[in-house]
Amino acid sequence: MTPLKEQLERLVSEMVSKGIRYEDAHREFEKKFIAYILSQSNGNLGKAADLLGMHRNTLSRKIAEYRLRRGA
């Protein structure tokens, strides 16, 4: 197993043992992932959308949904 898969396995196990639901984990992961990419792209929506593999409109909707800042 790769180090990343091992880390994920431990994280998932810990989250399940703490009663964290899939929906909550998914939302938090997506929020953090998008915030990181926005930061790396200096808030450039087009670049961030490309890096995320999603349409700019979808990214804009998710930024609003998660109340993220474009330059976050």
Model-found features: residue ranges?
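Bacterial C-terminal helix-turn-helix
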Residues: 2-72
